[in-house]
Amino acid sequence: LTFDAVAALPTGEATKERPTLFKTMIGTLNHNYLIDLVWQAHLEGRDHGFQARNIVLHHDLAELWKAQQAINRWYIDWSGRQTEQSLDETVHFQFIGGDPGAMTRGDILLHVVNHATYHRGWIAEMFFQVPARNPTTDLPVYLQSLGHGSDSEPRHSG
C-alpha cells in the first residue's frame, strides 16, 4: 500500500527533501530496506558491511520495490522454517554503530516487522506535506485488502 501510494504522488514528491531524519520518502523506504538487510545478515551470522543507516541503495522507486519484495520473500521463507526452539535462540551481533548486541531470533523478527511499520507511519505523515491522501498503515485494513477475514477464507480453530 505504501509503495503504491508513493508511486501515485506527483513527480518529484517522493524525492523532495522534507524535515525528517531520512530526508525524503525514498530515503525512508531505503532505510527500511537497509535495516531489513542488516537483520538478515545478523540472522545468517554474517557481516552486513553497512556503516550507516541512511544510505540510499536504490534511488528509483520501482527498483527499490523489487528489492524490498525480494527481502520480504526471504523473511517469509525464513519465518516458515523456524520452530519455537529456533526462535528462542540468541543471536550475537554488532549494531551499525559498533556496540555489541544480543537478541533472540524471535525478538529480531518482531523488531523487523515493528521497525518497518514505524517508518511507514513516517512516510504516511509526509503525505500531509504534499498534500495528498496518506496510505493506511493499519494492519487490519491491510489484511482486509488481501481478503483475510472474508467468509471464503478458511477459519482457524484454537
Please give the residue ranges for each predicted region.
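Short, contiguous alpha-helical
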Residues: F3, E13-N54, F95-G158
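Short secondary-structure junctions
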Residues: A8-P10, Q82-T83
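Helix-adjacent hinge/juxtasegments
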Residues: R46-L87
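N-terminal leader/capping segments at the start of a protein or of a new domain
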Residues: L1, A5-A8
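Carboxylate-rich helix-loop segments that flank metal/cofactor sites and access channels
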Residues: E84-G97
